[in-house]
Amino acid sequence: MDKERINEICGFVDKGIRDKVKLLLENGVETYESCEGGKGHAYFEPTVRFHGERAEGFRALSVAMTHRLEVRELKRVWVINDGEPTGAWWEMVFIPTK
């Protein structure tokens, strides 16, 4: 993904997680949802969701750790819709910086 597209996407991202999303995108992680977390937000903690096969979460974690981002959790997520598992996708949860 080129820098112009990354900057365009990041213009819609919560300020408190924008740098993390930008870093992941610049390193080829296909993010699709993020939230800086906290009161009044969709998540309690800063969270980024991204697409990828089994190994992608570990690759994204390596990117985050290499750049000294404070990751609290890495999850592979399936939700149950109408009794059937749907997914999977990845979630990376960061330690809040407040």
Regions found by a protein language model. Name each.
Residues 1-98:
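Structured alpha/beta or helical-core interaction and ligand-binding surfaces enriched in interleaved
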